[in-house]
From Swiss-Prot:
Naturally occurring in which organism (per UniProt): Mus musculus (Mouse)
PTM notes: Cysteine persulfide is reduced by thiol-containing molecules such as glutathione and L-cysteine. Phosphorylation at Ser-15 is required for ISCU protein stabilization in the cytosol, whereas dephosphorylation of Ser-15, due to the inhibition of mTORC1 (mammalian target of rapamycin complex 1) complex, leads to degradation of the precursor form and ultimately to a decrease in the mitochondrial mature form.
Protein name listed in UniProt: Iron-sulfur cluster assembly enzyme ISCU
Molecular function GO labels: ferrous iron binding; iron-sulfur cluster binding; iron-sulfur cluster chaperone activity; molecular adaptor activity; protein homodimerization activity; zinc ion binding
Modified residues annotated as Phosphoserine in this record: 15
Amino acid sequence: MAAATGAGRLRRAASALLLRSPRLPARELSAPARLYHKKVVDHYENPRNVGSLDKTSKNVGTGLVGAPACGDVMKLQIQVDEKGKIVDARFKTFGCGSAIASSSLATEWVKGKTVEEALTIKNTDIAKELCLPPVKLHCSMLAEDAIKAALADYKLKQESKKEEPEKQ
């Protein structure tokens, strides 16, 4: 009960501060939304394939990449079936809207592709699809790097699987 009362007081105090501050015209309030293309906003507000897969599984590849310049961190995972087709993909991204949108789009694009086909996905394709401005190209580069890292991890697991002696 005390927590609810405290939260209510906090909400009222915040509202009072907002009401006392000068109001911005609606035109100015909506300006930041125009900085992102509608495709970025869609993937940001409705991200596809958020979550994690079992990284210990032999058929799951995990890529973890980061951009020191902006602090974005992206984890992308793929699940590959016995025929070499990517059947699932998940991501978790700590970053801006463009980084989240790039991750979301990348997981959509890798699904249904073979491991080799997924290697052909380029950051320029992601940037073009999302209409990213030059200042946000590093986000699409992170997505490409995350795909490559996940594929490399998967391939490494497959090689070690072949080297393991068969259990009898």
